């Protein structure tokens, strides 16, 4: 039973993205954990600091920080409004940097502290930038935080890693914003990312840091051999996610 603070803006149901911080908290508590739902705009410096302080006070400290907040717009440069550019950078890059920054004093007191970004490997291939430059810049900003903070915090024993899915993941965002039912059927369940993240947090923070992990490859390294349980629909070819390097090969049988 983990103690989990859920810090996000969604206090009221969104017409296209189901669930709120409160429904997520209910699910955590039904599973045997303790939850602290906090309404937080990751662009707001005071709100982020307050959320971290409240979490540490409620649970007696902070062991893990997951930077998952993200804004997406898959538009090319002429079609990207500057307010959308700013939003993506404020949430993805700045939000990740700021949350990590203010978490450091709390994490320094933890026994096995981890920061995990849900962000991709830094594969500097033109094909990831040309179709949606603004989004890629913002998303890679999160990954640059991994690269820099892993080195900066290594001497303090704080691990900083990135985790990214090989395939699309069946979330409300995929359903309503990216590909509808067809893409959902070609996706994996969120549990693959949850299992991979859990495996990361069990690692020795002093030794396991600065890694850019692809979900199935990492789980395979941890001894997982059965990946069919993560599929939404058996027999439907899985849709690849953005940003997975061509050099990253799936484990044997993982995509079958």
Which sequence ranges carry the predicted segments?
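Conserved glycine-rich Rossmann-like NAD(P)H-binding loop of the short-chain dehydrogenase/reductase
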Residues: 2-23
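The beta1-alpha1 cofactor-binding region of Rossmann-like NAD(H)/NADP(H)-dependent oxidoreductases
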Residues: 19, 39-51, 82
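Hydrophobic positions on the long internal alpha-helix
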Residues: 51, 66, 99-103, 107, ...
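Substrate-binding pocket helix/loop in short-chain dehydrogenase/reductase
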Residues: 76-77, 81-86
């Amino acid at each position: 039973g983990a103690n989990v603070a859920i810090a996000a803006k969604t206090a009221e149901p969104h017409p296209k993205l189901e669930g709120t911080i409160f429904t997520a908290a209910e699910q955590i508590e039904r599973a045997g954990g303790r939850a602290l739902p906090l309404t937080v705009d990751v662009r707001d410096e005071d709100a982020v600091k307050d959320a971290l302080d409240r979490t540490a006070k409620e649970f007696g400290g902070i062991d893990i920080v997951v930077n998952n907040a993200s804004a997406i717009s898959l538009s090319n440069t002429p079609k990207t409004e500057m307010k959308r550019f700013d939003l993506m950078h404020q949430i993805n890059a700045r939000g990740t940097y700021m949350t990590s920054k203010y978490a450091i004093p709390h994490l320094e007191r933890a026994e096995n502290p981890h920061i995990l970004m849900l962000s991709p490997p830094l594969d500097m291939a033109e094909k990831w930038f040309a179709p949606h430059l603004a989004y890629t810049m913002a998303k890679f900003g999160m990954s640059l935080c991994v690269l820099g903070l892993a080195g900066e915090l290594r001497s303090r024993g704080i691990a900083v890693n990135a985790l990214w899915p090989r395939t699309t993941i069946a979330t409300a965002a995929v359903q309503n914003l990216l590909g509808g039912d067809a893409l959902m059927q070609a996706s994996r369940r969120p549990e693959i990312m949850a299992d991979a993240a859990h495996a990361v947090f069990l690692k020795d923070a002093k030794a396991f840091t600065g890694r850019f992990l692809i979900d199935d490859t990492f789980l395979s390294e941890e001894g997982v051999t059965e990946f069919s349980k993560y599929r939404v629909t058996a027999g439907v070819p899985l849709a690849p996610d953005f940003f997975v390097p061509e050099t990253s090969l799936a484990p044997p049988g993982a995509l079958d």
